[in-house]
Amino acid sequence: MNVIAKSVAVGLLAMAAGSAWASDGTIEFTGEITTSTCEFANGDTVNVELGHYSNTQFKTVGDKSPTTPFTIPLTNCPTEAWKHVDGSESKSFQLWLETRNGGTTGANNDLVAVTGSATPATGVGIRIDRASDGAQLALNKQNDTPVTFDITGEQTDVNLQAYYVSTVESSAITAGEANASVDVTIDYR
């Protein structure tokens, strides 16, 4: 091999080495797989009867029906504290509520859209709060300010409340079934 060919080969190798991608950062994942997580104690469904209300009860946007308290009984909960993503250590969790079918009302993404088998009502949605203080639970995302629930033992009750909220004036509400389903995930982060 002549000197020119060797020089070209060395030059090409040097150029290839110089074009390597530089890293701007690293993503490090941490977590834990647990053997004990809370489960719904009485099957995987909690039924909540919100009641029957006249559209005239909702005079303006934001009017509410009476609250309906309900409990999600949990069993097999962890009894030892664990470290959360914020660095704190406790026996607490958040609920991740994921809407189904109708999603959210659109006018207010914090209200569950109602559905019905025949003709669903319009102009109302369902709000879900922590019962102890009325802190609203976010839908399809985590709350900006965490709404946590403490684990008090292997059996723990999650006390919530729900109610209808109008998204339009009374005259624009249409009568019909006002049902909804929300999937619940217990979030230990």
Short names for language-model regions:
Residues 2-6, 21-189:
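Mature extracellular/passenger domains of Gram-negative fimbrial/pilin and adhesin proteins
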